Amino acid sequence: MEGKKAVISVTDHGFLYGDAVYETMRTVDGKVWLFDEHIKRFESSAKVVGLKIPYKKIEIYDQIVSLIKKNRLTEARIRITLSRGSNELDFGPAKNPTFLIEAKKLTFPPKELYEKGISAVTFEIERPMAQIKTTSMLPSILAYQYATKKKAHEAFLVDHRGRITEGSMSNVFFVRRGKVITPKKYILEGTVRKLIIKQTRAKQTTVKYRDLPKMDEAFISSTTKGIMPVTRINGKKVGDGKVGPITKKLLSNL
C-alpha cells in the first residue's frame, strides 16, 4: 500500500501522545542488516512501555522481505512502528495496538561528507527514557532544527551536568590519544555503536562538554548513515579539522 493511502485513527495514541515505539533498519544486497539485534531492541522497548508485539520475529522478517520484494528495493530503509492504538483518551493497557512496517529506497548523504567530514553543534537538552526507541522525539527534533539553523549537519545533546550523551539521530564517538571513547549513560544503544565498540574496544565513559577541545577525532554512527566523520563542532576544528586515521580505518572496514 502506498504511504499516502495508509490511515490510522485520529484517536491512535501514537498520534495523540507519541505513545509508540519503533525501530529503523536497512537492507544490504536485499537482506535485512542486523535484523536480530534490531528486533531484540524493539522487543525491549515494547516491554518497557507495556506493549505486546502482535507478530513473532520470523513473521515480521517475512513481512519485511515481502514488502521489499513488492517494491523492488535492493537498498532499503525499513521502519517498524508499534503504538498503543486507538484507546480513546484512556491511558490504560493497549486493546488494539497499531503495527506498521514501512520501506523505501535508502539514500545516503553525499560522498563528500564522508571524505571531508560534517559539522556538528551542541544543544542543551535531555531525552527522557533515552534507553528506548520511542516516537516521542521532540527533544531530538528541537536539537536537529537548531543544528539546521546553525547550518550544521548534526546536534550533540548535552545534559544539565554538561555531559555529551548522543546525537539527535546518532551515537557519538571521539578519539583521544589514539583511544576511541563514547558516552556510556543516558543514550539509546545503537546497533552500529555496538559493532564499533567491539571492533575498536572503545571505552564507554563520561564525555564532558568542556573536554571537546581535547579530542583528536570525532564521528557519529547510525543504521542508515553508517559511520560519518565530524570535523567541526560549534564552528571549531576537531583535531586538525580533517578526517582522522582511526575514523578512516573504520570507514573502510564497516
Residues covered by each model-derived region:
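Helix-start/capping segments and mature chain N-termini
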Residues: 1-66, 90-254
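Short, acidic/charged, Gly/Pro-enriched secondary-structure junctions
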Residues: 60-88
